[in-house]
């Protein structure tokens, strides 16, 4: 089985540690799938700067293929964070750099490449929405991370993504159970075949239009063991999707309740393990430079 991460890559800069880590939603899913024993590749755009080379080399070192990626003139995306009591705190970013500004367009050759994978994953940070309809004629399953921001919950945005997605992930730790279930129902009504909501310590909920399945979070016995929560949602999605694939999920075979239940448990276990990992998948190096001046701070943005 083969999993493709299509879209975003970014450097996660932890200012409290002075360390840069490779990351990005699409990258992380590919790396985690590889660590779970599947073949994996990443398809996207790297900047032609030192950080872009750092990302490409770090991803390849995980056994994830990057040979079909593009390298373009421009800066690499940088996200600035710190850790407070094990939780990541997002401070700002530079807009994603050339990866977001000039996203990859799927031509016939790349579509043939994508068709060789069982699952292709993308996200709101990938600027891949316009490419999703091109995947409709393939037997490749499509998963998409809808994140947590309200701008990605509007009817117009959901209608761009959901009809083309076999699985969507929603981060819902800020919502109660009723609001989470209502959101899951909406994305399925708008075309997603299966919707997964992760709710942090409150576990996760999956809905396919027929059945609703829930699972508790896998708790860390000693919170002091938690290194940071970077990549935990991506890890949950990957563990969930890999379990579905191994259970027979395909473009022509939707998962039944018992398989969804098992996949939720696998997702929770994978997310638990991710809490004990530094950054998204390690591979950190000293930053050597401060956060760039163009980055906004969340507290200022909300004013």
Residue ranges of model-derived segments:
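Extreme N-terminal starter segment of soluble prokaryotic enzymes
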Residues: 1-4
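Active-site metal-binding loops of divalent metal-dependent hydrolases
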Residues: 8-9, 235
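Conserved N-terminal subdomain of the carbohydrate kinase-like
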Residues: 11-16, 20, 38-119, 138, ...
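Short, acidic/turn-prone active-site loops that include or flank metal/cofactor-
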Residues: 24-27, 95-98, 146-151, 173-175, ...
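Histidine-anchored nucleotide/phosphate-binding helix
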Residues: 26-35
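A short, aliphatic-rich alpha-helical micro-motif
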Residues: 113-115, 162, 189
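Conserved beta-alpha-beta core of the PfkB/ribokinase-like small-molecule kinase fold
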Residues: 119-186, 201-203
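Conserved phosphate-binding/catalytic region of the ribokinase-like
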Residues: 181-303
């Amino acid at each position: 089985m083969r999993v493709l991460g299509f879209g975003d890559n970014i450097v996660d800069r932890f200012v409290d540690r002075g360390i840069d880590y490779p990351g990005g939603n699409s990258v992380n899913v590919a790396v985690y799938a590889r660590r779970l024993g599947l073949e994996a590749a990443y398809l996207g755009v790297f900047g032609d700067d030192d950080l872009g080379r750092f990302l490409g080399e770090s991803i390849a070192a995980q056994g994830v293929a990057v040979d079909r990626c593009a390298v373009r003139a421009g800066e690499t995306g940088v996200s600035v964070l710190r850790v407070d009591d094990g939780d990541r705190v997002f401070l700002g970013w530079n807009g994603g750099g050339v990866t977001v500004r000039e996203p990859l367009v799927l031509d016939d050759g790349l579509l043939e490449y994508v068709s060789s994978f069982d699952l292709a994953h993308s996200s709101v940070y990938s600027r891949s929405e316009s490419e999703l309809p091109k995947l409709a004629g393939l037997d490749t399953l499509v998963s998409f991370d809808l994140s947590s921001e309200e701008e990605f919950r509007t009817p117009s945005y959901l209608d761009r993504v959901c009809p083309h997605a076999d699985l969507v992930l929603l981060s819902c730790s800020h919502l109660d159970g009723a609001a989470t279930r209502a959101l899951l129902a909406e994305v399925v009504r708008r075309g997603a075949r299966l919707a997964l909501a992760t709710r942090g310590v409150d576990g996760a909920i999956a809905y396919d239009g027929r059945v609703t399945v829930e699972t508790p979070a896998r708790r860390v016995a000693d919170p002091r063991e938690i290194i940071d929560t970077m990549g935990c949602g991506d890890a949950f999605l990957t563990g969930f999707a890999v379990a579905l694939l191994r259970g027979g999920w395909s473009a022509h075979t939707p998962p039944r309740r018992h398989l969804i239940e098992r996949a939720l448990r696998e997702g929770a276990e994978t997310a638990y393990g991710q809490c004990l990992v530094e950054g998204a998948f390690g591979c950190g190096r000293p930053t050597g430079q401060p956060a760039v001046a163009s980055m906004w701070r969340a507290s200022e943005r909300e004013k």
